[in-house]
Amino acid sequence: MSQSKKTVALIIMDGWGHREDTTNNAIAHAKTPVLDRLTKETTNTLISASGMDVGLPGGQMGNSEVGHVNLGAGRVVYQDFTRVTKAIEDGDFFENEVLVSNVDKAIKQDKAVHIMGLLSPGGVHSHQDHIFAMIKLAAKRGAKKIFLHAFLDGRDTPPRSAKAPLEAADKVFEELGVGKTATLVGRYYAMDRDSRWDRVEKAYKVIAKGEGAFNVACAIEGLENSYSRDENDEFMQPTVIGDAAPIEDGDALVFMNFRADRAREISRPFVEKDFSDFEKGEHIDLSAFVMLTQYAESIDAPAAYPPVALVNVMGEWLANHGKTQLRISETEKFAHVTFFYSGGKEDLYEGEERILIPSPKVATYDLQPEMNSTELTDKLVEAIESGKFDAIICNYPNGDMVGHTGNFDAAVKACEAVDTCIGRVVEAIKKVGGDCLITADHGNAEKMADETTGQAHTAHTSELVPFWHVGQKTTARSGGTLSDVAPTMLHLMGMEQPAEMTGKPIVTLVK
């Protein structure tokens, strides 16, 4: 029988930032006896998870994709957001071969260029400036028909904040003298990632067919009507603006979201002829479907900014040294502990196993703030006790998923549920003589309302995140970032870190 392994577990509490001010702070208000005890008894510090420390523009809040890429890479990774923004500033964006050649194909046939994406200054899944640059590129290439299909945010931005981006889009069209916003739909429908195809179908039908729940004269009227129905930006029902502009054979469609996880589902019915998750009707024979970045290897479409290969990320380094690893989370964050943590690689490494716990099927997670954390912990504890794994990467989605709802009381419950689970995990790790690192990918639940506007604060924050180490005797340094976490794990495992990992261990073993 093989010897049991002394597991090193990385527990990522999604959306769990540190904020001294307890006002509207669900984490501070939650009863968290386990983490309170760990703060008193174990090595702990605060680390950075936002801005330039994770490869984002200075001051930009962190997010789950960026967080997990940095956690797994062991180096600061230049993010797609920054990459595209820089290309626009340099002018390279307007010469991008994939964008230019595919837009030109439609223009030569006197066909329309459709642009879809999250029209938001949020910077998590997209940025409105990227969308405006794409509209300008299409106009510059000579497109006479440019249609914007705007997804509304209200999740990474205040719940009712779409007016300014919509007005800015109208201004761009006015200045160019061509194009218009054709449809509006909340991201709840257009950006699902949990196979809720009934939602995606509604978004697809309004974008592709011009079939919405409502028809209005202009975007602002549509938005005001949505608010009068008590629908915040995120939940706005599919709305057609003016004369419908359905997508036709020969048209080009450019998807301007740069983050992959919530872009995959809505892409598929446009790309796959034999798509069958809902009845989409006649397949549209597009001249091109272009992804801003690669959403998945399985989506057969060109990417304007394909992934930059990351060599010797944590998963690869472990596999190359004959180590075993487990990735485990609920559906909502499964892509993060697998695809993103592996630096954009879908496939399993040698010695890697994965456990997916389905997230609860509820409309919004404030209805079940504990989500399926108990089942997740059952499987996680079982894996630790099995002695099979050298390394375990686990994500608890609660702080982020419930934080995004803006429901303070539910967020408190979510944090309490996670604390209880952490208690079980720590006990299991202690039993097997392993090490446990507990941290977060970004903040969220520590700020649930905006003091200035009085609105719910549903977005991430730029706060530092906590970092605890349970296990061998260590001391911690200050000034760490997410990219220092993989080197910390390797240090605790007694392994060298690859040259590509430029991060430094946050804790040092005390001899």
Swiss-Prot record:
Cofactor-binding details, from the entry: Binds 2 manganese ions per subunit.
Signal peptide positions (record): none
Residue sites binding Mn(2+) 2 per the record: D14, S64, D441, H442
E.C. number(s) listed in UniProt: 5.4.2.12
Disulfide bridge map: none
Positions contributing to substrate binding: H125, R155, D156, R187, R193, R259, A260, D261, R262, K333
One Gene Ontology biological process: glucose catabolic process
Metabolic or biological pathway, per its Swiss-Prot or TrEMBL entry: Carbohydrate degradation; glycolysis; pyruvate from D-glyceraldehyde 3-phosphate: step 3/5
Gene Ontology CC annotations of this record: cytosol
UniProt keyword terms in alphabetical order: Glycolysis, Isomerase, Manganese, Metal-binding
Cofactor section: Mn(2+)
Catalysis: reaction(s): (2R)-2-phosphoglycerate = (2R)-3-phosphoglycerate
Binding site for Mn(2+) 1: D400, H404, H460
Coiled coil: none
Gene Ontology molecular function: any one: phosphoglycerate mutase activity
Top-level class of the enzyme under EC nomenclature: isomerase
Residues forming the catalytic site: S64 (phosphoserine intermediate)
Pfam families linked to this entry: iPGM_N, Metalloenzyme
Family of this protein: Belongs to the BPG-independent phosphoglycerate mutase family.
Assembly and binders: Monomer.
Function: Catalyzes the interconversion of 2-phosphoglycerate and 3-phosphoglycerate.
Protein name, as recorded: 2,3-bisphosphoglycerate-independent phosphoglycerate mutase
Native source organism of the sequence: Pseudoalteromonas atlantica (strain T6c / ATCC BAA-1087)
